[in-house]
Amino acid sequence: MERCGSWSDCEAAAAAAQKAVPAPFLTKTYQLVDDPATDHIVSWGDDRVSTFVVWRPPEFARDILPNYFKHNNFSSFVRQLNTYGFRKVVPERWEFANEFFRKGEKQLLTEIHRRKTSSASTASPSPPPFFAPPHFPLFHHPGVAAAQHHHAFVGDDGVVAAHGIGMPFPQPHWREPNLPVATRLLALGGPAPSPSSAEAGGAGRAATAAVLMEENERLRRSNTALLQELAHMRKLYNDIIYFVQNHVRPVAPSPAAAAFLQGLGMQARKKPAAANVLNNSGGSTTSSSSLTIAEEPSPPPQQQHLAGEKSGGEAGNSSAARSSAPTKLFGVHLSAAPCGAGSKRASSPEEHPPTSPATKPRLVLECDDLSLTVAPSSSSQQQLSAASSPTSTS
């Protein structure tokens, strides 16, 4: 194995070797992005120069990733992009950018380097068992241990490499805690990163963490606002339901409107009855009296009912009084005499159908055969005979 004269020479040689060939991940990523057959899934960005967009992540992970890598995990692909310095351009879609990842300039991929972590233990795989050489002291005085460690790793790196010292140890208690970072990484066998690259990696991680925290905070605020709005709408809904159930009653019609509607219904039912009364009274041949019916405004239904009962009672009382007491005209007793040729039979109830409560019939007696008999005052009560046709009122 060829030895380097100093650490700077070894680092320069390693950097030159790495620049000659880009990382396989970058080469495969460039190929899958530059493939025109899959532009509907992944393609160059809007500027078609320095960004690329994954339009359909599910299809990208299912159909494209297995063709270039040994997995189909989209999250793992994104993590690899982050380790090589790619950044997400906009949060709305999976668009990534890197200043050296440009269309038609594949040679620039050698300028893209993997970010180095601050501790080699986080980037290295689990170590094999440590077998120290016989001349390598595990426990020494701190000052002597530091000097021997530095001499062993720098002067005799072949022996160290042969024994696998380049791997991290489960319990590295043999190292000095207060040694510089470069010395510790040298003891572990990994290349010591320059301070600028370490600071850049730390700044990149800090920026990514800040962006993620800001996005989480924004989502949390949005979620809180939505929950508050939902609770407010539920409260309004419950208040409306409570108000309708406990404070709203059906509106009853006013008395005037109710009477008007009831009157319309009763008149519609009673008009045929009034027409029948007119027809029956006009066609009667058993009485010479004429019946004249005059329409008057109908009172309310309750008053009509009371008036009907009252008129019925008065008619019964008056007919009974007329049958028991003599008839007088201007203080002169009248004797009933048949009108016309002879006495007429009493009219049957069928000939006089009941009239409607809305109409009050007025009876006008027309009889030409009325006879008056004036008896002397000394004689006992003699009645005047008057011929009149008996009429009945309903």
From Swiss-Prot:
Q: Under which name does UniProt file this protein?
A: Heat stress transcription factor B-4c
**Post-translation changes:** Exhibits temperature-dependent phosphorylation.
Family matches, as InterPro entries: HSF_DNA-bd, WH-like_DNA-bd_sf, WH_DNA-bd_sf
Complex formation: Homotrimer.
Q: What is its main location?
A: cytoplasm
GO cellular component terms, alphabetically, are:
cytoplasm; nucleus
Q: Does the keyword tRNA-binding apply?
A: no
List where the motif Nuclear localization signal lies.
269-271
User: Motif Nuclear export signal: which residue numbers?
Assistant: 365-372
Could you tell me what this protein does?
Transcriptional regulator that specifically binds DNA of heat shock promoter elements (HSE).
* Region (Hydrophobic repeat HR-A/B), start-end ranges: 219-248
Q: Which SUPFAM superfamilies match?
A: Winged helix' DNA-binding domain
Can you name the source organism? Answer: Oryza sativa subsp. japonica
Membership in a protein family: Belongs to the HSF family. Class B subfamily.
Query: What's written under domain?
Result: The hydrophobic-rich region (HR-A/B) corresponds to the oligomerization domain.
Short name of one Pfam family: HSF_DNA-bind
| Listed Polar residues bias regions | 316-326
